[in-house]
């Protein structure tokens, strides 16, 4: 007999932890973090960036993850219901915005997972591309075909199956994905570090050039990486927290999840830095030339992953095996995050009164259709990634505002301090949620919009049709907010009618 939604719970702490790590560990750990670390490194090393990155883990990511866990467990509702429960009826639109931002990311994230699946199959069945031209040919031929649509559909279908039975199927999938992913990452790191010259890359990664800390851009990039990397403020942890038992400590799991995520990012960086420095170093390239390769954004910011890594694997002993493991791990990382995004969207529909299977079918169908433009056009993909990636800063601030609306201290005392199974949580969390998170979120938002106006689209920042303009953000956010404000009372009524 199928368990009622209100009664579903994770079967164990381990099952919950694996699922929470599945949220945090995604493709960004493996392809974005090494590139951003290299981009923000100085002539001597990238260690200063790592320092700033760790600081923001404790100032942004962990406080927001704790807030999400509290909201989800207390309300037993998705993002809309949680905001209604904690902040009040008038703030249903805020929960809707948090949910829709992550749903919009789902549309094109599924396309990314499709890329990873395709490359895994290619690495498994075809010779590795040995030159830059061959690597570009592999990428361009794929993008020019109908295959991106096919693999986008495969990703959505697998994601739908993974959440079909609710938390019971989610935890079963993550119990396989996450340990396998961690094993793949560790094996890949070991192989990379045994290559000649690999430790030059490791030395660069961890050597601090302290003067870099005076560069505001480094701090903003470190904060952005935390905001995008851990999943804090997306509403994903809130959604999984619906299914946790009270004895599962919120604080301890928030720390383990966030720190575990950053460890995976560091392992991925060790693998990438070690491989790139070894192979290109043996070809006689200087450190500066090697770093130029690592900083290359490429198509849809994936140049290092899909253009350079395959040809580097082709030049190393046992490279085919490592390439297969690399793209299998990338696929697993993508899937573990994708299913949490699909569960968030489905859970909101369930809270509005839909049956789970109907909600999942709606989410999968709409997500596939809405992802088609990103699958067919990389400019549209880049636009959606920019617009909704920046909107995550607003989502993080909204989560903090919901907690403040209820009462930060009251929530900490009721939901954490009265739980003997959890770690203690001092007033640093209160201060972070009230002051630090809003300030950081607004600062990031202003910075990214200023980059749009001065760097990405300086000549047409006012043009809503320009992929990276300020106006394209305002128009798309404004359209979503207008609809949500119009539907606010209806959403609140539906949530409360289902609760009653």
What are the functions of these language-model segments?
Residues 1-31, 64-69, 73, 77-83, ...:
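Membrane-interface "cap" regions at the ends of multi-pass membrane proteins
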Residues 2-14, 171-339, 347-354, 358-362, ...:
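Membrane-embedded translocation segments of transport machinery
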Residues 4-7, 35-44, 79-97, 110-167, ...:
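Inter-helical loop and helix-membrane interface segments of multi-pass membrane transporters/permeases
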Residues 32-54, 70-72, 76, 86-87, ...:
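Transmembrane helix-loop boundary segments of multi-pass membrane transporters
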Residues 64, 106-131, 182-208, 274-279, ...:
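Hydrophobic alpha-helical segments and their helix-loop junctions in multi-pass secondary transporters
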Residues 88, 94, 99, 144-145, ...:
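C-terminal membrane-solvent junction of multi-pass transporters and transport-like membrane proteins
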